[in-house]
């Protein structure tokens, strides 16, 4: 069975939609919002890799590696900020993040 580019784009669109719904439907938990953003970035990476393989060009795959690197750094920094915020406030609810001073 041949898996064409349409299959990859369908899976990527589903992943992107789930990520968008995760952001808009769950506004109380910051960790789930970060996970939804990561899911959106992974769906974009899947698009880059699928088109790169379809067009026989490595630029999309190299760009996807750069996006993965930036996404890993973003997740690490975001989680570190959340850990410090939890130690100071005792909660990581979005309502508590909105009352930050500075």
Swiss-Prot record:
Its EC number is 7.1.1.-. InterPro entries: NADH_UbQ_OxRdtase_chain4L/K (IPR001133), NUOK/Mnh_C1-like (IPR039428). The keyword Translocase applies. NDH-1 shuttles electrons from NADH, via FMN and iron-sulfur (Fe-S) centers, to quinones in the respiratory chain. The immediate electron acceptor for the enzyme in this species is believed to be ubiquinone. Couples the redox reaction to proton translocation (for every two electrons transferred, four hydrogen ions are translocated across the cytoplasmic membrane), and thus conserves the redox energy in a proton gradient. The gene is nuoK. NDH-1 is composed of 14 different subunits. Subunits NuoA, H, J, K, L, M, N constitute the membrane sector of the complex. Keywords: Cell inner membrane, Cell membrane, Membrane, NAD, Quinone, Translocase, Transmembrane, Transmembrane helix, Transport, Ubiquinone. It is a multi-pass membrane protein. GO terms for biological process: ATP synthesis coupled electron transport. The keyword Lipid biosynthesis does not apply. GO terms for molecular function: NADH:ubiquinone reductase (non-electrogenic) activity; quinone binding. Belongs to the complex I subunit 4L family. PANTHER family: NADH DEHYDROGENASE SUBUNIT 4L-RELATED (PTHR11434:SF21), NADH-UBIQUINONE OXIDOREDUCTASE SUBUNIT ND4L (PTHR11434). This is NADH-quinone oxidoreductase subunit K. GO terms for cellular component: NADH dehydrogenase complex; plasma membrane. Its main location: membrane. It is found in: Cell inner membrane. Pfam families: Oxidored_q2. Coiled coil: none annotated. It catalyses: a quinone + NADH + 5 H(+)(in) = a quinol + NAD(+) + 4 H(+)(out). The chain crosses the membrane at residues 5-25, 31-51, 66-86.
């Amino acid at each position: 069975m041949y898996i064409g580019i349409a299959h990859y784009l369908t899976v990527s669109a589903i992943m992107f939609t789930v990520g968008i719904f995760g952001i808009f439907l769950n506004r109380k938990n910051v960790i789930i919002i970060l996970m939804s953003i990561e899911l959106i970035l992974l769906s974009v990476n899947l698009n880059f890799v699928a088109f790169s393989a379809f067009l026989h060009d490595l630029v999309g795959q190299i760009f996807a590696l750069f996006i993965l690197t930036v996404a890993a750094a973003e997740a690490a920094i975001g989680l570190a900020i959340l850990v410090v915020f939890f130690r100071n406030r005792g909660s990581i609810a979005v309502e508590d993040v909105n009352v930050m001073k500075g």
